[in-house]
């Protein structure tokens, strides 16, 4: 990962190296966080952030599904995203807003655990590699089944929901594939 200089954390910009959280963070133990993955691209009119209002809306919707009360409004988060790109002098970037529970009570009910928000932006080329567009990619069907949409809100981008995809990706790469397609369970099919 190509680190940038600054990360927005709980309302202020801090040096990348200083953007740390406790190993006792509820999210680290239980996967109770949400995020977005947003792209900024250099264009004829300058840097543009793809569908920023839609991404911010989904971040807030995902947070609501996980009972994370974001301590900032949408305008503050939108500006933090824009400023993260600008202050890091990025014309093209990957932007990762993350909402997560900090340190506090353990257990499945984080009722008095503080909610933190971070926004990181960095230079990240093509997701499947710079040659993928020209050379194509090798894709396999994973032995891991996609998590049922009845298990959690399928439109929420929850950090815990990506463990399934991580297992499948590790397996795919281990046998020389570039990417994967998870099996659909019967209840995922229309």
Task: Cite the ranges covered by each PLM segment.
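Helix-start/capping segments and mature chain N-termini
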Residues: 1-72, 79-83, 106-184
